[in-house]
Structure formats: structure tokens, C-alpha cells
Amino acid sequence: MRPGFSPRGGRGGFGDRGGFGGRGGFGDRGGFRGGSRGGFGGRGRGGDRGGRGGFRGGFSSPGRGGPRGGGRGGFGGGRGGFGAGRKVIVEPHRHEGIFICRGKEDALVTKNLVPGESVYGEKRISVEDGEVKTEYRAWNPFRSKIAAAILGGVDQIHIKPGVKVLYLGAASGTTVSHVSDVVGPEGLVYAVEFSHRSGRDLINVAKKRTNIIPVIEDARHPHKYRILVGMVDVVFADVAQPDQTRIVALNAHNFLKNGGHFVISIKANCIDSTAAPEAVFAAEVKKMQQENMKPQEQLTLEPYERDHAVVVGIYRPPPKQKK
């Protein structure tokens, strides 16, 4: 036998368990599934130790060797997964209906409206309090502008239990599912998406979540779906179109109650790729003001998104009472 050659195939070698590409390897199984920019924990070290660049030991599906307590940093054991065999504490965030899971690393989570169901392969965690078992779903800020804004410290998000939300640019329903968790069974999410391919996924999400009403239609023509959508408390928009402020304004005029709120995600590139992002954001804010939309807060989404900002404001604010 050659010196330095192990007959057992070198567990933990370059491609095997905990190696560089195998189980719990390079940020794949047990990492954040390539969760852009090294997953949740920032740049990460390419995921040795079962996805250190992920949520320290994985944040996506438990992968092989997961819940059995192995899986080198998978879900149940090894070096720190989402639960990692330790007690995790879930505490309420200052935004109502949103929670923080405190473990080895903190994560933003929402209370799962449909326990036992993942929507896009996100990690779930169950917390038992006496007889009551509550399941939470991890909310990845690299895949959701709202989560990025919350972790970026936005002052008000206006999406809370019991409210009605018109969500423009719903895509496959990843963020919509978390909004559905937040507003709960008393609230409603009207999810508008133009692409039929994404719309199919959105409809599948809505089948299990009774508070989501999918609308497969162009948000530029709100009159086409006015029979489906009632008055709402909040409009959220992530449409990435050059005329997106006009699109939001049209929908606000149709469906947003006076004194209601809007949350708009602006991608500078989509509006004017030649101008500086700050100039684009300022121009969009000006357009909003001309449409009876009063911006109250603006926030960039670094480090989760480049050249993105979220603008939060109020629609047709009630006139100030003169004393």
C-alpha cells in the first residue's frame, strides 16, 4: 500500500463528507444553496464545515446526514446548524408579526401559517411551549426585499397581522408567503404577477394559503382585476420597471385607502442605468409626490442588494388640523 494512502476513502477529503463539494460541502447541501454572497452570514469561507458561508452549518434543506444529528453542521447536530441541537429562543421583532430566532446566529423568521410546509426549501424550526407547538420559517434577506429592509433597520413596514396588502410583482411567491404568514388568517394578500410561468408557482403557493389571492395580470392595467381586489391598507411593489412609480400610483388610486401606506422597492438599474442610483431614487420620490403619495422614509438595501432602495410612505394623508 502506498504511504499516505488511506483505504477508507479519506472521509472529509476533498469531495466526501464535509469536504469541498460533498455532503455539507461547498455551501450546497447544508449551505444556503448558494445563497448569494456566501449565504446569510456574509462572505463566508466557501462553506467548509458544512457551509460556514451559509447560516453556519446550513440553512437550506437538512441534506443527508441532517436530522440524525450528523451531517457536520447540518440541522440536528455537528457544528451549529439552524437548531444545532441547542435551545433556540424565538422572540418578537419590533415589527408586529415578525420574529427573531436567537441561536448561534440570529435569523429573521415568520410564524408558519401552514405548519409542516416549506414554500421554497427554506429552513423551518419548531418551538414547543408546554403543549403548544409553533413552527417558524426562516426569511432570507438575499431573496426578499422586505426582509432586507427589516434587517436594514426600516422604521415602519406597515405589514402586520390583520391588514390587507396589494403585492405588485409577486413572482413565484417566496416573499408573498412570508407576507401571508405576517398578516395571518385575518389578513389578505392580493398577489399580482404578469409572468405566467411565475404565476403557476404563485397559484400553487396560494392553494395551501387561503389568505393569498393570486392575480395573473399586468399591474399596468388595474381596471382588469378591479373585480377581484378590494380596498387595501398597504401596497407593496417590486416590479423593476422603468415606469414603476406610475404603475404603483395607478394601483394606489384604485385600491389604496386614503391614509394607507405604500412600500416600493426601487432598482436603480431598471429605471436609468446611466444615472447615479441616488439621482434615480430622488427622481422617483419626486414622481411619487406628484401622485398624492408622500414618502416618509428611504433606505438602501446594502449589503443584501446592490443599487436598490426601499421607499415607505403614506397615500393621501389626512389634512393637518389647524389649531
Swiss-Prot record:
The keyword RNA-binding applies. GO terms for cellular component: box C/D methylation guide snoRNP complex; Cajal body; nucleolus; nucleus; small-subunit processome. It comes from Xenopus laevis. Its EC number is 2.1.1.-. Residues 276-308 are annotated as: Helical. It catalyses: L-glutaminyl-[histone H2A] + S-adenosyl-L-methionine = N(5)-methyl-L-glutaminyl-[histone H2A] + S-adenosyl-L-homocysteine + H(+); a ribonucleotide in rRNA + S-adenosyl-L-methionine = a 2'-O-methylribonucleotide in rRNA + S-adenosyl-L-homocysteine + H(+); a ribonucleotide in U6 snRNA + S-adenosyl-L-methionine = a 2'-O-methylribonucleotide in U6 snRNA + S-adenosyl-L-homocysteine + H(+). The gene is fbl. InterPro entries: Fibrillarin, Fibrillarin_CS, SAM-dependent_MTases_sf. It is found in: Nucleus, Nucleolus; Nucleus, Nucleoplasm. One of its GO terms (molecular function) is U6 snRNA 2'-O-ribose methyltransferase activity. NCBIfam families: PRK04266.1-2. Residues 1-78 are annotated as: Disordered. S-adenosyl-L-methionine-dependent methyltransferase that has the ability to methylate both RNAs and proteins. Involved in pre-rRNA processing by catalyzing the site-specific 2'-hydroxyl methylation of ribose moieties in pre-ribosomal RNA. Probably catalyzes 2'-O-methylation of U6 snRNAs in box C/D RNP complexes. U6 snRNA 2'-O-methylation is required for mRNA splicing fidelity. Also acts as a protein methyltransferase by mediating methylation of 'Gln-105' of histone H2A (H2AQ104me), a modification that impairs binding of the FACT complex and is specifically present at 35S ribosomal DNA locus. It comes from the Eukaryota. Pfam families: Fibrillarin. Signal peptide: none annotated. By homology to other fibrillarins, some or all of the N-terminal domain arginines are modified to asymmetric dimethylarginine (DMA). Belongs to the methyltransferase superfamily. Fibrillarin family. This is rRNA 2'-O-methyltransferase fibrillarin. Keywords: Methylation, Methyltransferase, Nucleus, Ribonucleoprotein, RNA-binding, rRNA processing, S-adenosyl-L-methionine, Transferase. S-adenosyl-L-methionine binds at T174, T175, E193, F194, D218, A219, D238, V239, A240, Q241. Gene3D superfamilies: Phosphorylase Kinase, domain 1, Vaccinia Virus protein VP39. Disulfide bonds: none annotated. The modification Asymmetric dimethylarginine is found at R8, R17, R23, R29. Residues 7-44, 63-78 have a biased composition (Gly residues). The keyword Disulfide bond does not apply. Component of box C/D small nucleolar ribonucleoprotein (snoRNP) particles. Part of the small subunit (SSU) processome, composed of more than 70 proteins and the RNA chaperone small nucleolar RNA (snoRNA) U3.
